[in-house]
Design a protein with these regions (language model features):
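Short, compositionally biased low-complexity segments
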Residues: 6-10, 58, 236-240
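Local cysteine-cluster metal-coordination motifs and their immediate loop/turn environment
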Residues: 51-67
Length: 338
């Protein structure tokens, strides 16, 4: 895409990363109807599970996810109790339909204690019929990680860790309230590989406050030096009327459309030069990774978590605000954690 075309197409429209968009959801699908949809799935239908854990110990100002800050662990305990009830209810409707993929997002799943990582993973395996090979991915915040948690995630069956970086520039990090050094990130990547996790994804953002073209390229070089199998490069969406905490970002420090385009292109050029293949709009993968292979062979799919190679028949969302996709339609849980 040329710079002129990118600027011409710079319109305020719903993001391509989520479809259907928020205004399309309505209250017309009842709990009973959702249960029928689950039971109507063919017995051989493959299932992908998404588990939402909407808590962080601090809010990143750029975040557009359904999450809330808590400095106490008791709300998380109460939430996990309610989540267990939902898991058992959905599991009763799904029966022995095979689960082929599981993703934990948030929020910060890495905020969970070692005990709750183990008990939640155990509950999922006891409730659902896991296939022989299940891809288990989790979003990890390096600020939450401890030596004990690496082993806990490995014991839970983690196969891919997704780590948010956004940008390594200290000025940008202060502006978005996400302090995370390169050395800290490298330690997490090395530690998670040491316990046997074979795949790592790193998320980057462009269009952030005080971010520059050179800074985006520098971050891409640092990310590539960590050798993640996958990299996601998303554009920051500034919607303070929807996410009030984004009002902490001074709009005057945000790059314009031209600068955003150049940041994206600069980071892309670095990643491609480092051997990554571009996958769709916003993903990159090393040539041997399943995502790159699927892109080359036409087997790539996309869901609410981004691109995937898992050919599941239904995506089941668990937890507050979680979205599911079934042959009969899309569903979303209520946002409230109460």
């Amino acid at each position: 895409m040329s710079e002129d075309l990118a600027i011409k197409l710079n319109k305020a429209v719903p993001r391509y990363t989520s479809y259907p968009t928020a205004p399309h959801f309505h209250s017309g699908v009842s709990d009973e109807q959702y249960g029928r949809w689950l039971r109507e799935l063919p017995g051989s239908a493959t299932i992908s599970l998404y588990l939402h854990l909407p808590f962080c110990d601090r809010l990143c100002w750029f975040c557009g996810c359904h999450t809330k800050q808590t400095n106490r662990y008791s709300p998380i305990v109460a939430y996990l109790e309610a989540l267990t009830v939902e898991i058992r209810t959905v599991g009763a409707s799904l029966g022995d339909r095979p689960v082929t993929a599981v993703h934990w997002g948030g929020g910060s799943p890495s905020l969970l204690s070692v005990e709750d990582i183990a008990s939640t993973a155990k509950q999922l395996r006891q409730t659902f019929a896991f296939a022989n090979q299940v891809e288990f991915s989790v979003e990890l915040d390096p600020n939450d990680m401890t030596d004990e948690k690496y082993g806990a995630w490995a014991d839970a069956g983690l196969s891919r860790a997704s780590i948010g970086v956004q940008d390594f520039d200290p000025e940008v990090q202060v502006a978005i309230n996400r302090i995370q050094t390169y050395e800290q990130t490298r330690h997490v990547v090395e530690s998670i590989r040491t316990v046997g996790v074979r795949s790592v994804n790193i998320d980057m953002l462009y269009g952030l406050p005080y971010q520059t073209v050179e800074g985006a390229a520098d971050t891409a070089r640092q990310v590539a030096s960590l050798h993640p199998e996958r990299v996601a490069l998303f554009g920051y969406a500034h919607v303070p009327w929807m996410k009030k905490h984004q009002g902490m970002i001074d709009e005057k420090t945000l790059p314009d459309a031209t600068e955003r385009y150049r940041q994206c292109e600069a980071a892309t050029e670095v990643l491609v030069a480092q051997g990554y293949e571009r996958v769709g709009f916003d993903h990159f993968a090393l040539p041997h990774d399943k995502l790159a292979i699927a892109s080359r062979t036409g087997a790539l799919r996309r869901n609410f978590q981004g691109y995937t190679v898992d050919p599941h028949d239904a995506l089941i969302g668990l937890g507050a605000s979680a979205i599911g996709r079934l042959p009969q339609g899309y569903v979303q849980n209520v946002v409230s954690t109460h």
